[in-house]
């Protein structure tokens, strides 16, 4: 707001990202019957609980998927970019077959190696912490969440997130992971936007920018409108 005002423009409206995200991702039925929307970002995880079409609870937990990346970098003694690449390509939030994963060798920089089991062990520990924090915010209202829990954001794209969350809450709650884009987004053939949930926030904000705030009027038009 300060930046916009400093540029001598007026703020038309301030949008709250969790609200715009809920409007673009959740169906009317989900909001009405009760659900939890969990936006797993890089540095924060936002939990929004809806019931009877009203946002009942909004909590931001200061931990996200980047923490798992930093754990990988620290434990395997590699660069953060390499750690992120390994997490995206091979990472799992829950590794059931640990013995089998141990035999899958992953190449690291400077001629070093690790195995998929070790990588996922690091990721699983951090995701367990994140999901425990999520469940701590949801548990009290869990019986009211008829439409279950909806995950979105870049951190929610990791494999086996469903299984990891079930290990945390020990309940048979309906879980949906948003991977596509909002239905109202239209693109040209030359425009590429990753269809993986990582852009959900910015796209939801764009969908709410439905007013032309840069219409130029001549002095004559301004006088005619008075």
Q: What is each of the regions a protein language model found here?
A:
Residues 1-35, 93-109, 113-119, 141, ...:
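Nucleotide/phosphate-binding catalytic cleft detector across ATP-hydrolyzing
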Residues 16-20, 61, 88, 178-185:
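Short, ordered loop/turn segments at secondary-structure junctions
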Residues 178-225:
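Glycine-rich phosphate-binding/hydrolytic loop that grips phosphoryl groups
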Residues 131, 135-148:
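Phosphate/pyrophosphate-binding loops at sites that engage ATP/ADP/AMP, CoA/4′-phosphopantetheine
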